[in-house]
Amino acid sequence: MPRARLIVNPSSGKDRGPDYLPGINEALRTRFGMMEIVMTTGARDGEAAAAQAARDGCDRVFVAGGDGTLNEVVNGLMAASALDRIPIGLLPLGTGNDFARMLCLSEEPGEALASLALERRVAVDVGTLNGRAFINASGGGFISEVTEAVDDRLKSIAGRLAFLIGGAHVMRDHESVAARVSLPADSFRPLSFEAEERRAEGEGWRTEGGRMVLETRLHMFAVCNAKQIGGGRLIAPHARIDDGWLDVCLVDEMPMLDFIGLLAKVAAGGSHLGDERVRYFRARELEMRFERPVKVNTDGELLEAAACDYCVLPGAARFLAGTDTSNS
């Protein structure tokens, strides 16, 4: 039985996943020997295929797809208790490919294959939301509303511009949400404008039973293992995938014109952290409670929840990476 498995999302790469498949298959077979190819056709097919690969004794799993397909594979290997045992090789064929950049993998298939052939293995942190794993980021509010507005057909036609189109569509009806955020005080690491005056009683954060607590209204939030979302939007510029922390970005309620300007700063490369209405900190675990169920996008997977419990699993996954991930 082949010792490696290739899981392919045929709708990735503007529906060009199958076009890349012969070259990918030949290159991987030359380097790693015979392997079975599994084509996904529906939600969580990648998860089932990855779990089956672990049960079949595979020692490598390759993923040809985007961040959503990768998320399914991570969850499948975690369910099979094989996440720290079987390395994942990512061939980034999606629209955003945000996590591939953290692994220093090219979006050009031939170059990515050359990097994977080096078999440089790295340990990578994994985040969880309500027990389900994510590898790149989990975001709610405006972020997830945009994701819901951007379907596969729009991504196939417009590529990364789809997220801008979706954002313009969502802006008209978007509303902020009341939120209660709490985390252990000993794992609170402020990184931007969390100065003493913002942590004072009644001015933001407060201490309550050994926990840091914040009650506010949010336009959006992102809990990040990696730096980027939405095809290169630098939401968490200080995040690393191997530091044992989640980087958290909370965007407080503000006038809509100000919010539009802030989104432009995110797109421009991380200057949003200079806005005092942005809270940026690190945490190992985090609880969020909302006045109503909010849409949450976790590596492309959408759900609605009024309670979100996050934690990090340090070094829980193994990946094949490019030549230099020192800044990832």
Predicted regions and their residues:
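Catalytic core of DAGKc-family lipid kinases
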Residues: 31, 40, 55, 78-197, ...
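Short amphipathic alpha-helical segments
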Residues: 18-20, 74-77, 101-103, 148, ...
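Short glycine/serine/threonine-rich phosphate/pyrophosphate-binding segments
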Residues: 46, 68-73, 98-99, 124
